[in-house]
Amino acid sequence: MKQAFRVALSVLMLFVAVAHAEVRIEITQGVNTARPIGVVPFKWDGPGAAPEDIGGIVAADLRNSGKFNPIDRARLPQQPTSVAEVQPAAWTALGIDAVVVGQVQPGADGSYTVSYQLVDTSGNPGAVLAQNQFKVTKQWLRYAAHSASDESFEKLTAIKGAFRTRIAYVVQTNGGQFPYELRVSDYDGYNQFVVHRSPQPLMSPAWSPDGSKVAYVTFESGKSALVIQTLANGAIRQVASFPRHNGAPSFSPDGSKLAFALSKTGSLNIYVMDIGSGQISQITDGRYNSTEPTWFPDSQSLAYTSDQAGRPQIYKIGVNGGTAQRITWEGAQNQDADVSSDGKSMVMISTNSGAQHVARQDLVTGAVQKLTDTFLDETPSLAPNGTMVIYSSTQGMGSVLQLVSTDGRFKARLPATDGQVKFPAWSPYL
């Protein structure tokens, strides 16, 4: 926990200029069918008002997961401040089988101790299912709340929580010297900061598996180039600037390789670079176009988009040789895949009758499920726990970020007010 705080703190210290117009999650569908839960306002043991509404953040996290529906505060049957004060029968009468209570204690040194308890109200009434406490400074109160959310979520679902993750995305603002910005924020849009500003387009950010670096495409030199930027110090390393197109970077899960697409020989092909040595190997070779690589968890094989069958479809190939295998067969065309961390499924953009939507394919059975009904969906990116997808879509005259659960039931959007938002990429666990 302390190590995670230090890593993230180094990032915040570098990027002190926070962008003014932050994105925020607005739920549009699905929360009413989720599992009800109680999240009580955390007891504040200090003078005046609490510096953060920790209970509100935990409730928002659980609601944003699409799996829980925290009861409105106005409907809380009681507001216990400790485990001993929880009256299980009052909660089970509302169909609630678990309650989160907590406390925030200010310290003389300027720190805060955030404590929480997840209490069973049904199976073993009054039993503590999970609990923890975090001593943090003021700027880390939201992180402490996300930590409580992660632990509660995992205890109740057996799925690792992803509330301490971040998203990277590109914002195109209106006018100014640097209209293109690569930004990073918490998964819920808070604590947004600018990683890089450019007078020319930025595209396709991709996270390193340890969350310390972001690869992306820049056109600042007048042509496309692939770079890797270290978040802690801002250092930028150029890794590819060949003739024609350099694009679609993707880190291998083990962090040793970077896959990308180059068109230096005419058509687009997939290449893989050993990050340590800089050696580049060509993976695909043909007159057709192959692009948008994404890794399987073994770091030895890739899914990618190719038009070798006439229209874009998704294929799988080993990075050490072998024949490519087509893995999408439903829909007029499929592209821009992101493989889940367990390798059992992927999300992609599927086009039928001229409409392109986010779809999920089970890689074991081949079954495909359409997840969205928004317009001109692009660049889906999975949360590291595989429960949610972030993507961009066209809304009105611009592009915005959207969220959808991988079962298609929960939907939300993250509107921004200062430009078009594209190319979202969900971070690994941080």
From Swiss-Prot:
Subcellular compartments: Periplasm
Biological processes, Gene Ontology terms: cell division; protein import
Main localization category: periplasm
Entries under InterPro entries matching the protein: 6-blade_b-propeller_TolB-like (IPR011042), PD40 (IPR011659), Tol-Pal_TolB (IPR014167), TolB_N (IPR007195)
Assigned GO CC terms: periplasmic space
KW Cell division (keyword) present: yes
Signal peptide per UniProt: 1-21
Swiss-Prot/TrEMBL keywords: Cell cycle, Cell division, Periplasm, Signal
Family: Belongs to the TolB family.
Function: Part of the Tol-Pal system, which plays a role in outer membrane invagination during cell division and is important for maintaining outer membrane integrity. TolB occupies a key intermediary position in the Tol-Pal system because it communicates directly with both membrane-embedded components, Pal in the outer membrane and TolA in the inner membrane.
HAMAP family per the UniProt record, alphabetical: TolB
Quaternary structure note: The Tol-Pal system is composed of five core proteins: the inner membrane proteins TolA, TolQ and TolR, the periplasmic protein TolB and the outer membrane protein Pal. They form a network linking the inner and outer membranes and the peptidoglycan layer.
PANTHER family, per database record: PROTEIN TOLB, PROTEIN TOLB HOMOLOG
Entry protein name: Tol-Pal system protein TolB
Organism: Erwinia tasmaniensis (strain DSM 17950 / CFBP 7177 / CIP 109463 / NCPPB 4357 / Et1/99)
